[in-house]
Amino acid sequence: MHGLLLAAGLLSLPLYTIAHTQPSGALSRRGVDLDAYRLPEKSSYTNTNDVQENSAILSLNAGSYVDVATKLVKQTIPSATFRVVDDHYISDTGLGHVYFRQTINGLDVDNADFNVNVGKDGKIFSFGNSFYTGKVPSASLTRDHSDPIQALNGARKALKLPVKTEKATARATNRGEYMFKGTSGALSEPTAKLVYIVKDDGSLALTWRVETDIGDNWLLSYVDAKDSDKVHNVVDYVAHATYQVYPWGINDPTEGSRQVFKDPWELPASPFTWISDGRQNYTTTRGNNGIAQNNPDGGTEYLNNYRPNSRNLRFEYRYSPSMNPPKSYTNASITQLFYSANTYHDLLYTLGFTEEAGNFQVSNGNRGGKGNDYVILNAQDGSGTNNANFATPPDGRPGRMRMYIWTRANPPRDGCFEAGIVIHEYTHGLSNRLTGGPDNTRCLNGLESGGMGEGWGDFYATAVRLKRNDTRNTVYAKSAWASNNPGGVRAYPYSTDFEINPLTYTSVNQLNEVHAVGTVWATMLYELLWNLIDKHGKNDGPKPVFRDGVPTDGKYLAMKIVLDGMKIQPCNPNFVQARDAILDADKALTGGENKCEIWTAFAKRELGTGARYNRNNRTGSKEVPNECK
């Protein structure tokens, strides 16, 4: 369920505790703690209010939005060398999003990013920055390094990777990378590239970035370029017709019955429908947005795996929660997963997760972005139980979702039938593609940023399941059905009542695991959700209604500005910066109409105006701006 972090899944906490973690994922099973290798969180964020007070920044308004953004980077850090990442775009709100990567001695600094948001008026709106500003090493030092095979072996040994390298050879490519041939144990050929990284102490290290996809983990390992036994940091990309299905909005079998839907796609979001990619029409669970199949052995092959085929396009199969074993309802499981993932794709598209923003599609139809990256949807995946995960590589490479069987009930329960799990997993793809730009899915790798990656998944899953008669007093537990526990898999259920959920910003001071941190973030977003619903009402339909580009109700408005905030925030943001990005997203979308509702929601949970981030001692605040008192 990580998009970019440890290859753990949905369940990482025992049911009623917040401090203890239950490790999961392949590397954890091999005794390797990837949390110890997280990249440092070094980003700053200058919100739109601060920009408005800086005349030097406001004067930058000549040329295209990319030109204006480039001038800002040069003005902010004149001595820096950098490149424009080729994934800039103008979103549906009119903001231009431009991403830069710092370079030193011709090499990328892999965790030194600068993102600039440019307003419709051609002026700087806000920006984030994690560029290195220390002493630049001599270019001659870039020639003093180990060979790439030594680096691959260093990563293999340190992380206990199941990759055999005895016959490995390295071949240089025209992209400045080395591709390894003769290895076994990885899903694709490993690669290595010489890059710098900024370490936790602020110094610079020359490293080999070794990429290995081993299924449960898809790793970028930063191996010291001189000492191959030293791994500085690690990023993990994994985080894990008619259709008879539980309808969208029904979270699990306890909430409703299955129904038959005809042609349920939204053509503006899926112009080829769900069962075509524009080149070929399919009679199975395959199309432009995803390909769903059974994967009982947990292997890496998917194209030739079993999926239901219906020449008359009737994907209607028997299922009830009492059926056992799970293989007796494989067709229904695959169909439900295919339906849920595609429906969410279409909803996110209407909210702004489009081709140019890095969404998951085979064909982008000349709408920008990189294609050939539908989501591989594995139902009843045999590589694990009681969990799920999602791997998010950069734009142009397929995402991968693994859905497991949950064994905490008799008979076992299939995670594909709990929509909240599917939504949570897919949201890792959303947040990783939007934060830092589609080509950089390494921007949710810190404890707080990774925690928010988990929290966004819970937030969207909860927002989608809201019912007509729900109020701000409604309480929802995460994955209660699959886990066979009314309290779900989080330390607390989502509630606006402190007696039910007491979490605040300073709770994070006692937490060291991303799912626990994510529960705090999702709790704050649940407060935001209800503040906006109380102000604007709630649309109980499956998609938003827009007026001048703004959702007319509070539920979809909250989902929209949270999504837009991901586009605006810096790489590896903390809670304070992500809060500011949501405020800025509302200002860009509505002119700041909901400023006080947003501030009040965050301040209730100690993320008010005086909140301060310090990774060891966060300061909470329940203060709001004077105009919101």
UniProtKB/Swiss-Prot annotation:
- Protein's name in the database: Extracellular metalloproteinase 10
Q: Which keywords annotate this record?
A: Glycoprotein, Hydrolase, Metal-binding, Metalloprotease, Protease, Secreted, Signal, Zinc, Zymogen
For Zn(2+), which residues are the binding ones? Answer: H424, H428
The lineage, from the top, is: Eukaryota, Fungi, Dikarya, Ascomycota, Pezizomycotina
- Mention one GO biological process in which this protein takes part, according to its record: proteolysis
Where on this protein are sugars attached? N281, N331, N469, N617
What does it do? Secreted metalloproteinase that allows assimilation of proteinaceous substrates and probably acts as a virulence factor.
Q: Which cofactor does it need?
A: Zn(2+)
* Species of the source: Coccidioides posadasii (strain C735)
EC annotation from Swiss-Prot or TrEMBL: 3.4.24.-
Q: What's in the GO CC field?
A: extracellular region
Which Pfam families does the record cross-reference, listed alphabetically?
Answer: FTP, Peptidase_M36
Question: Primary place of residence?
Answer: secreted
